């Protein structure tokens, strides 16, 4: 399963999620909303693409610059709906030192240690970071990656029986390409991963890029990060099929 998650906030939050039973992995890649993608004959920030044309067009734009599986889905969810879904799992314990400096954390009342944070507080914190023009897009995206990483690590055992069903219950408020068959596949994949005898490879990173003059653009490092995200060699990246669940 490969899904582009879009949190439909004032500044949208984007995370690529790749769950693969065959590779026993959950890989998460936070994509900065400022990343410039092709849209309307020019390059615009992914957030602007979302505002103009929605999540399906964002998935298409990312697929034009990266070797995404052809069956990559999208899931756009409002912050209030996401907060309600995530609240059932309780607070997650997150460390933000890999994303933000001690000074930046202090500005938001956060310490350098691992701390518990509720779904609502996590959303408020990430929204504030997105609005902070003194931070590079990579900093705020890295904080988002840290939250999602903590969530999947700490809630994995509960996800097979709760996450797909939770999405079904709020399906009327989602913008998504996920079908009933896709949700059943997600459920089976999560069940396999949650009960795996081997440690699940859970990683969460931020998509690198060139940040200069107020523009965050695709670089060789960006493409290499996407190849690594899908566990692909450079040669295989051009033929990513997404045939695994």
Predicted regions, residues:
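Flexible, solvent-exposed short loops/turns enriched in glycine
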Residues: 24-54, 98-112
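C-terminal solvent-exposed extensions
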Residues: 10, 27, 35-42, 173-245
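Extracytoplasmic
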Residues: 9-14, 23-31, 57, 69, ...
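Amphipathic, coiled-coil-like alpha-helical scaffolding segments used for oligomerization/assembly
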Residues: 51-111
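Entry/capping segment at the start of metal-dependent catalytic domains
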Residues: 1-29, 127, 190, 225-226, ...
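Extracytoplasmic/secreted envelope proteins and their assembly/folding machinery
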Residues: 13, 55-63, 79-87, 123-126, ...
